UniProtKB/Swiss-Prot annotation:
The lineage of its organism: Bacteria, Pseudomonadati, Pseudomonadota, Gammaproteobacteria, Pseudomonadales. The gene is metXS. It catalyses: L-homoserine + succinyl-CoA = O-succinyl-L-homoserine + CoA. Residues 51-360 form the AB hydrolase-1 domain. Its EC number is 2.3.1.46. Substrate binds at R227, D357. Coiled coil: none annotated. This is Homoserine O-succinyltransferase.
Length: 379
């Protein structure tokens, strides 16, 4: 990693931690007596405090969305292609806030946090949290930072669900909502994929009912399988065919059940191995449940248009043609509801072969459209 950062990078960033001592009531009926949220900021908050943008992360995301933590970092933050000087979320214009949600495993209070009463990791004792809970905690962070209204709340996938929830829970605090590769709720198929992933973790002998940290182990096999299943759904058939096809790792087949023979097998095992070394199993369970439970229209007799009746934000919805996890049809469903509710909404369906993960990839047309929308936001 060079010590001189690219001209369009936010450069070195230092995470900050906000502590909240006021209890947070949760949708599950429990509450968190106190909690921490770790976050990063990029750019400068203007005098009018009108240029703040909130970034909401997806399932395995975190607060480190842009820049570098040290000169030795091999890779920048997970959305560095979109955040920085001259990029779609231009830090010469906007003050950007990115946090790790409650239940995460990157510094915010979650299952791997130590219970002050027992001195042990909270593990499975950490309560189930929802998208609505996250938005409520994010609103407290906004209060702490002195931000009354977000110029924009932006997210992809699960992050897009949070952006949508902001316009429902705090309609007067969001001026623009950008929901990318997202959906108004999960389909039965999506819930099914999440359940397969959860069962892989829950049935791993090293899971120990969620208390694996106390035993100094991790449910590695379960996490690997969960990630492998999930990763397949993030890619399109075309992109997998182009990248791997039926390519072999070696020149011939071994005719057994244990060898890694196809290149796609090797790739999935690598992804699972890498993920199991950096992500908490209890957090994975929580994140998938938050996805499953997101269904804001359920509180409005399943009328999605009524769900957004009080929203004052302008909406930008983007989807990708080969995304079959959150297909363009789901985005169009959202757009139709917003139009029925007479909201200001624009929609872009981007032709991209990469599948669901396309929202993380610097596709020129995507970045251009993203930037064009952000440039129209008045401060």
């Amino acid at each position: 990693m060079p010590t001189v950062f690219p001209h369009d990078s936010v450069g070195l960033v230092t995470p900050q931690t906000a502590h909240f001592s006021e209890p947070l009531a949760l949708a599950c009926g429990r509450s968190l007596p106190a909690y921490d949220l770790i976050y990063e900021t990029y750019g400068q908050l203007n005098a009018a405090r009108s240029n703040a943008v909130l970034i909401c992360h997806a399932l395995s995301g975190h607060h480190h969305a842009a820049g570098f933590h040290s000169a030795d970092d091999r890779k920048p933050g997970w959305w560095d292609s979109c955040i920085g000087p001259g990029k779609p979320i231009d830090t010469n214009t906007f003050f950007v806030v990115s946090l790790n949600n409650l239940g995460g495993c990157n510094g915010s209070t979650g299952p791997s946090s130590i219970d002050p009463d027992t001195g042990k990791p909270l593990g499975a004792n950490f309560p189930v949290v929802t998208v609505e809970d996250w938005v409520n905690s994010q609103a407290r962070l906004a209060d702490l930072l002195g931000i009354d209204t977000w110029a924009a709340v932006i997210g992809g996938s699960l992050g897009g669900m949070q952006a949508l929830q902001w316009t429902i829970s705090y309609p007067d605090r969001v001026r623009h909502c950008l929901a990318i590769a997202s959906a108004p709720k999960l389909s039965a198929q999506n819930i099914a994929f999440n359940e397969v992933a959860r069962q892989a973790i829950l049935t791993d002998p090293e899971f120990h009912g969620g208390s694996f940290q106390e035993r100094g182990v991790i449910p590695k096999r379960g996490l690997m399988l969960a990630r492998m299943v999930g990763h397949i759904t993030y890619l399109s058939d075309d992109s997998m065919g182009e990248k791997f096809g039926r390519g072999l790792k070696s020149e011939k087949l071994n005719y057994d059940f244990h060898s890694v023979e196809f290149q796609v097998e090797s790739y999935l095992r690598y992804q699972g191995e890498e993920f199991s070394g950096r992500f908490d199993a209890n957090t994975y369970l929580l994140m998938t449940k938050a996805l499953d439970y997101f269904d804001p229209a359920a509180n409005f007799n399943d009328d999605l248009a009524k769900t957004f009746a009080n929203a004052t934000a302008k909406f930008c919805v983007m989807s990708f043609t080969t995304d079959w996890r959150f297909s363009p049809a789901r985005s169009r469903e959202l757009v139709d509801a917003l139009m029925a509710a007479r909201k200001d909404v624009c929609y872009l369906e981007i032709d991209a072969p990469q599948g669901h993960d396309a929202f993380l990839i610097p596709i020129p047309r995507y970045l251009q459209a993203f930037g064009n929308y952000m440039n129209r936001i008045s401060l």
